[in-house]
Amino acid sequence: MNFLWDKVTEWLKELLIGSIMSNLTGLFDNVNRQVAGIADNVGATPQAWNGGVFGMIRNLSDNVILPIAGVILALVATLELIQMIVDRNNMHDMDTFMLAKWVFKTACAVVIVPNTWNIVMAVFDVAQSVVSRASGLVIADTDIRIDSVIVGLEAKLAEMELGALFGLWVQSMFVGFTMWALAICIFIITYGRMIEIYLVTSVAPIPMATMANREWGQMGQNYLRSLFALGFQAFLIIICVAIYAVLVRGIAVENDVSTAIWTCMGYTVLLCFTLFKTSSLARSVFHAH
């Protein structure tokens, strides 16, 4: 009877060890895939991310928002001219330099507004260049090679009792579930950020029409800061995932397998929190409201 029980126990241990190793191997592989996937998603320009949505947004901006921006530009320029005349004692104290300055500012605004789309895309091209360079370094430095540690981990598991192995199996399954939750979190952040970019760029001509005005110019300046914040939010996301992947490397050298699994769980929750904070942090850095 003891012989039969030993065989069943040995079979269950082998089954649990194989399942635990499979879960942990998939866990490490998922980290590597997520780093590469985030680099592709957040590092893409609006045009490269989805050409169909990009074309629709540009068409709406050129045909609906741009005429409104032209009206706003004319209104802002007229109000500035009236204010300048009033401030100069109804032109009694006005010199040609002031008038030339107004003409120059208005001409600059007339040039900027029709080329708003090119200016906006240039901002994201700069951000994409930065993210591409950073993601290359991140993927190279945080790729976790499970082949180098799997033998030692199997030896540790083989020394454990059946009950402890079952507990580890449950824990590894739970941590694997959190990785799926993390994937959903990353999906929401990356796709939500791109949709926000499309929404912001669709109305770009309106704030850009106010850039040349002294009083209304804050609207355009804050809009540009918001664009840079959205662009460089991708860089912060890359850094968050890179830090996470480096921290997860500790599971390969942790003596206590259970502690390693729960540490990985804690890092996953921390990553979700920091990813959601990247938007407010980027806006704070660029002082965008």
Would you name each region that the model predicts?
Residues 1, 9-23, 94-112, 116, ...:
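Alpha-helical transmembrane segments and their helix-start/interface "positive-inside/aromatic belt" motifs
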Residues 1-72:
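Binding/recognition "hotspot" determinant
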Residues 24, 107-203, 237, 241-286:
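Non-cytosolic segments of integral membrane proteins
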Residues 33-65, 85, 89, 109, ...:
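Internal transmembrane helix-loop-helix hairpins in multi-pass membrane proteins, together
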Residues 60-64, 95-99, 103, 165, ...:
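Hydrophobic, aromatic-rich alpha-helical transmembrane segments
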Residues 70, 74-86, 237-252:
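Juxtamembrane "helix exit" motif at the C-terminal ends of alpha-helical transmembrane segments
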Residues 72-108, 203-217:
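Hydrophobic transmembrane alpha-helix segments characteristic of membrane transport
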Residues 208-225, 252-254, 283-287:
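Alpha-helical transmembrane segments
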